[in-house]
Amino acid sequence: MNIRPLHDRVIVKRKEIESKSAGGIVLTGSAAGKSTRGEVLAVGNGRILENGEVKPLDVKVGDIVIFNDGYGVKTEKLDDQEVLIMSESDILAIVEA
């Protein structure tokens, strides 16, 4: 995938979740709901501050993140993959193993 996000934008691939119902039935896809976790595929150079300096992003390629799946998060299809384009501010946490 050849894509380079600009500024404080981040490209994330949503991770599939598997959950079970109260009866033990495995729910996948739309029945399980959309995951708000994903893997960072690409990051921009950083956020431009008011003084013109560029602040590097805290997230890096390969990080597993929890994100806000709301307004401002754009879904795109690239190389037959659905990816999300978001600002770093839409990322709530980095999952550390």
Curated annotation (Swiss-Prot):
Pfam family of the protein (one): Cpn10
Keyword Metal-binding: no
GO biological process: chaperone cofactor-dependent protein refolding
Entries under InterPro entries matching the protein: Chaperonin_GroES, Chaperonin_GroES_sf, Chaprnonin_Cpn10_CS, GroES-like_sf
Keywords, comma-separated and alphabetical: Chaperone, Cytoplasm
Subcellular location: Cytoplasm
PROSITE patterns membership: CHAPERONINS_CPN10
GO molecular function: ATP binding; metal ion binding; protein folding chaperone; protein-folding chaperone binding; unfolded protein binding
UniProt-listed SUPFAM superfamilies: GroES-like
Leader peptide range in chain numbering: none
GO cellular component: cytoplasm
Subunit structure of this chain's protein: Heptamer of 7 subunits arranged in a ring. Interacts with the chaperonin GroEL.
Family the entry assigns: Belongs to the GroES chaperonin family.
PANTHER family to which the protein is assigned, alphabetical: 10 KDA HEAT SHOCK PROTEIN (PTHR10772), CO-CHAPERONIN GROES (PTHR10772:SF58)
Function text: Together with the chaperonin GroEL, plays an essential role in assisting protein folding. The GroEL-GroES system forms a nano-cage that allows encapsulation of the non-native substrate proteins and provides a physical environment optimized to promote and accelerate protein folding. GroES binds to the apical surface of the GroEL ring, thereby capping the opening of the GroEL channel.
Protein name: Co-chaperonin GroES
Source organism (scientific name): Cronobacter sakazakii (strain ATCC BAA-894)
Taxonomic classification: Bacteria, Pseudomonadati, Pseudomonadota, Gammaproteobacteria, Enterobacterales
